[in-house]
A protein has these predicted regions:
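Short hydrophobic-aromatic micro-motifs
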Residues: 56-58, 156-163
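Cleavable N-terminal signal peptides
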Residues: 13-14, 24
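A mature extracytoplasmic/lumenal domain signature
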Residues: 61-63, 76, 163-166, 206, ...
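Accessory, solvent-exposed terminal regions and/or long lumenal/extracellular loops of proteins
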Residues: 29-39, 126, 181-421, 425, ...
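Surface-exposed, glycine/proline- and aromatic-rich loop segments on solvent-exposed faces
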Residues: 48-112, 170-191, 196
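Sec/Tat signal peptide C-region and signal peptidase I cleavage site
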Residues: 20-26
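A cross-kingdom signal targeting lumenal/periplasmic-facing segments of multi-pass membrane
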Residues: 86-154, 334-345, 350-352
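Bacterial N-terminal signal peptides that target proteins for export
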Residues: 1-11
């Protein structure tokens, strides 16, 4: 039996994983590094392409273990038919992650004794089923208040759409049919049943998985129509004893998306920090996120990126092209500019225009701080925002002029400000920061006679 690690992290928050396996000016400057989801061991990712009441939801996975043990249960707002489900390209979530990740940029000071005319803007280079007759099973299902609304196969997945009258019956049905429910599922299933939601249940078809040749399970993509713009995160909390990270990419033709039942807060951005952070950017961003997550009482959604998908400045990765946007679920694209009746591949939604605005939201949640599912709304706000952190390298050549001596004198104040900023952002020890800065930039200091010449204005 193949043992795998799924290629793209799964939205643990959205799924109950039922298995034995262990449980994933302009913005110009030179792009250096990004803080992508690889920083978080259990980072879950979901893509929501939404226009009006129409949504295409792409779900990715970080399940580890035998594929025969993998299964997910996802609350959905309506009955899902076979034509509304497909498997997505495995790299599409990674592309969105790379494009929208918080990024580190760097600048290099010019020679103050030989100033150059700086262009106003500069684009950065890119970073690169069990036995028994069907009649018997139907009778047993009905006695539990569970109805199988649909049953089909998509790619390497066998999929069921269930409705239920009460949570005990659904829990019993799932256990009888080989889905091992974690303790506590009963109480968390109740609110979804009361809300008349359905349950999307998927497990791996081993024969089809072997035939596919893939070494990982591909993301599942679901298209549906509902006024509810939400993610049901509560069910997934059954599996987690620790804080979980959820990254939500919302694609919209309108503008920024936000969480409505919790505050949406911008991640700190546009800060100058010491140049040694270039080699420690992952540690820096994790520490900074934890610091502000704690300051906000651990119950906010952080905005990490909001931008028109057609451009970026600086670019941590190339913007997604038209085909990639379609793979991400965008169904309102119109390549020809005047054909509004084309159909999104695999789904029944027509294209309408080519606006795509991306919002990246980062939620770190626990059951006590996030007792409700996430509710969203899109807005008309098209303001650009990114988590962006700046390295400003000092000029280290000869400074044999008055402007050079003044520049050199100013560096100590600048370095101290960068150290203080880093300490405030991360709660790192200020003395350790200062020591690392000395090792990085060397001993750039002014002598007594240079200070005297500056005092004389020379």
């Amino acid at each position: 039996m193949k043992k795998i690690r799924l290629f793209i992290p799964l939205i643990i928050a959205l799924f109950a994983v039922l298995s034995f396996a262990p449980t994933a000016l302009a913005f110009c400057g030179f792009y250096v590094a990004k803080a992508d989801t690889k920083l978080y061991n259990q980072a879950s990712q979901v893509v929501m392409a939404r226009d009006g009441n129409k949504t295409v939801l792409t779900m990715a996975n970080d399940f580890q273990g035998d594929v025969k043990d993998f299964a997910v249960v996802v609350p959905v707002p309506t009955v899902i038919k076979e034509e509304q489900v497909r498997v997505a390209q495995p790299n599409i979530v990674e592309r969105l992650d790379a494009f929208s990740a918080p990024r580190l940029v760097e600048y290099f000071d010019e020679d103050p004794c030989s100033p150059q005319i700086r262009p106003q803007s500069m684009l950065a280079p890119t970073a690169a089923a069990r036995g028994g007759s069907s009649e018997e099973k139907a009778m047993a299902d009905n006695s539990l208040g569970v109805t199988v609304e649909a049953r089909f196969n998509v790619g390497e997945y066998d999929i069921l759409i269930l409705s239920a009258k009460e949570s005990n019956g659904l829990e019993t049905w799932l256990n009888r049919n080989g889905y091992k429910i974690p303790r506590g599922a009963n109480q968390l299933l109740k609110p979804y049943i009361r809300s008349s939601m359905k349950f999307f249940v998927a497990k791996v078809n081993l024969d089809k998985f072997e035939e596919s040749g893939y070494q990982f399970l591909r993301p599942l993509q679901i298209a549906y129509e509902s006024p509810k713009f939400m993610l049901p995160i509560r069910l997934g909390m059954i599996n987690a004893n620790i804080e979980q990270d959820l990254i939500v990419y919302i694609l919209s033709p309108q503008g920024q998306a936000e969480v409505t039942n919790y505050r949406t807060v911008k991640i700190p951005s546009n800060m100058n920090i010491p140049v040694f952070v270039k080699n420690e950017f992952g540690d820096f961003y994790k520490s900074m996120f934890q610091t502000f997550y704690t300051k906000e009482d651990k119950k906010v959604a952080f905005l990490e990126y909001a931008w028109d998908m057609g451009n970026c400045d600086p670019c941590s990765a190339q913007p997604l092209n038209t085909e990639e946007l379609k793979q991400a679920g965008v169904f309102w694209l119109d390549n020809n500019g005047n054909n509004n009746n084309r159909i999104a591949p695999g789904f029944g939604f027509p294209f309408s225009n080519n606006n795509v605005y991306i919002t990246r939201l980062h939620v770190r949640y626990t059951r006590n701080k996030f007792p409700e599912d996430l509710m969203f709304q899109t807005t008309s706000n098209r303001e650009s925002f990114q988590g962006r952190y700046v390295l400003q390298h000092p000029f280290t050549g000869n400074l044999q002029c008055s402007a050079g001596r003044e520049y050199k004198r100013s560096l100590s104040r600048r370095f101290e400000q960068e150290a203080q900023t880093l300490a405030q952002l991360t709660n790192w020890n200020i003395q350790n920061i200062r020591q690392k800065m000395k090792l990085t930039v060397g001993n750039i200091s002014t002598s007594w006679w240079e200070n005297f010449l500056m005092f004389l204005g020379l």
